[in-house]
């Protein structure tokens, strides 16, 4: 069974738990959580991840800055990134994709939509 390690970057503990709980449905998954982009970069420097899922609106370092930094770092640039946006936040979603995000999921998060998006990313990476 393949194993996947996901980095969930979200400032809301409730939303982080919701996303992590959904990802646990993927067999062989390990989930690591970060509360903002700075925390995410620390975790990236210490562990290998298969997919990063990041909220856009966060304190200290937002998800758009994180996407940009990941894409511009040779160590992390090939890790798929899924941005999580508020429904109707078309500008932020488009900016995330233009900065190099592979996909997006809108809030409120529908578990099946999240899992479908993650599974598509995993399959394309294989």
Question: What feature does the model see in each segment?
Answer:
Residues 53-55:
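Active-site T/S-Asp motif of two-component receiver
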Residues 33-51:
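Acidic, metal-coordinating helix/loop segments flanking the phosphotransfer/catalytic sites
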Residues 109-118:
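C-terminal output helix
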Residues 58:
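Receiver (REC) domain active-site loop signature in two-component systems and cognate sites
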Residues 13-32:
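Two-component/phosphorelay signaling modules centered on CheY-like receiver
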């Amino acid at each position: 069974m393949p194993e996947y390690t996901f980095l969930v970057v979200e400032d809301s503990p409730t939303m982080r738990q919701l996303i992590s709980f959904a990802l646990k449905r993927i067999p062989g998954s390990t989930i690591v959580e970060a509360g903002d982009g700075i925390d995410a970069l620390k975790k990236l420097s210490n562990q290998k991840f298969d997919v990063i899922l990041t909220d856009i609106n966060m304190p200290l370092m937002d998800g758009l800055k994180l996407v940009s930094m990941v894409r511009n770092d040779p160590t992390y640039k090939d890790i798929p990134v899924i941005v999580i946006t508020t429904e109707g936040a078309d500008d932020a979603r488009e900016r995330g994709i233009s900065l190099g995000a592979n996909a997006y999921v809108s809030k409120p998060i529908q578990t099946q939509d999240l899992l479908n998006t993650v599974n598509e990313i995993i399959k394309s990476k294989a």
